Amino acid sequence: MVSASNTKHVAHVDSAGGGQVWVDGDILYIGHMRPPSGTTLVDISDPRNPRKITTIPVPPGWHSHKVRAQNGLMIINHERFGQEGPTEFGGGLAIYDTTDPANPRQISKWLTGGKGVHRYDFDGRYAYISPTAEGFVGNIVMILDLIDPENPVEVGRWWIPGQNVGGGEVYPWDNYVSPRCHHPLRMGDRLYVSYWHHGMFILDISDMSRPRAI
C-alpha cells in the first residue's frame, strides 16, 4: 500500500484478537494474544469474503502472538503467558509447512528454555529472534538459519555485556530491570534491535556468526 487515501472497509474477520497479522499470497495469518487461541489462517483470495480455514491452539500458560510466513513456511513464537500451564510444552520457535494451508504441519521446533521467544524478523531463510537462553538474564539476540527448516541451526547471538551471568559476567543494573531484547529487524547488513528499557542498538551482521554493535 503506497497511500491510505480512499481506503474502504470491505470485510471483517471475527477472531480472538491479534498480536500480529501477516499476509503471504492469499493467506492471512493471525497470531493471537491469549490461549487457547494460537494462530489462525484465513483464506483471503476473495477479500470481500474472508474464510477461516484453521486455528492452531496453544495450551494454558503459553501464547503464540507473533507469526511470519513466506513461500510455504510459517514460523510462530511460543512464549510463557501467565504462570499456569504445562512446562513440558516449552518456549521457542515452531516451524510449520503451510503448502497446504488447511493442514499446517509442524516440522520442527527450536527450544530456547526459559520463557521462550518474544518477537522476531524472518527473511525467508534467517530468523532474527529475541529468546531467553540458558545462563542469560533477560532476552538476547539470536540468529537462526532455516535453510533446512527441519533442522534449524543457530549461527550467531549477541547480548548486552552483563547478561551472560552463566559465563561469569556481572549483572550491573541495580534497578533489577532485566535487559530484554524486544525485537530485531534486519535491513541489509544491519540489525536494528530494540531493548525495552535499555534503548536501541544497531548491529553489523555482515558476519552473522559475530554480530557487532556499531
Model-derived segments and their meaning:
Residues M1-I214:
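Feature marking well-ordered beta-strand scaffolds used for ligand recognition
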